[in-house]
Amino acid sequence: MDNKKIRERTEEEIDLRKKVLLELLELLNKKKIFSFIWGGVLLGFIRDKNFIKWDWDVEIGFYSKDFKKNWSIILKLMEENNFTVDYFNFEELKINVSKYTSKETTTFSLMGWRYDLFTGNYIRNKLNVPKKYFEKMEKIKLFGAEFFCPSPVTEYLSYIYGNWKVPLKTVNKNEYLSSKNLRKNNWFLYCKIDKFLFNLFN
């Protein structure tokens, strides 16, 4: 996506984004599936007490073991509650859903984080977060709900974004993510391992 194509969401679209997030949180909590917010949604909540209007997705995180264990349950929950499943890939530990608006307006990205035994980081593709931020989650309150997030949250945001207090209107990850966070890792090695195990036992 070109920065020239960045679009600020309307108040109505932001309200629907909030509605869907709260629905998702309630569904996961009812099934006792632990989740947390991270990335741009967390940045907006801490800095602006709201969503970032030009952000296109809402990131909901899971520990990989929880996500894999509940994979089929989560997909069934989405289907039963009228979510559109726009993309899912078990190896990538990723499910993208949308509701009430198009996926272009808001994509809800449910993603598992793998622990890398070699580096001591929690990882996704080219994303690297030290274990200490994921060891003990903290709660933040917004929209009348409680959300778990990496802790300590402001230190985590500094690690991920650098100067996170200054809004940066861009879709280029090389511009808005810190070099400590955005670098190559063993993500695809773990994808291959999970694929092998999945095929072996299914």
Name each model-derived stretch.
Residues 39, 88-91, 171:
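Acidic carboxylate-rich catalytic motifs and surrounding loops in phosphoryl-/glycosyl-chemistry enzymes
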Residues 12, 18, 104-202:
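Catalytic cores of NTP-dependent nucleotidyl/adenyl transfer enzymes across multiple folds
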Residues 13-20, 61-92:
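Metal-dependent nucleotidyltransferase catalytic core
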Residues 74-121:
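Acidic, glycine-rich loop-and-strand cores that form catalytic or ligand-binding grooves
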Residues 1-38:
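Helical scaffold of the NTase/Pol beta-like nucleotidyltransferase catalytic core
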Residues 22-25, 29, 75, 79, ...:
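Non-transmembrane alpha-helical segments in soluble domains
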Residues 25-58, 65:
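Active-site nucleotide-donor binding segment shared across nucleotidyl transfer reactions
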Residues 33, 80-84, 162-166:
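Short aromatic/hydrophobic-glycine micro-motifs
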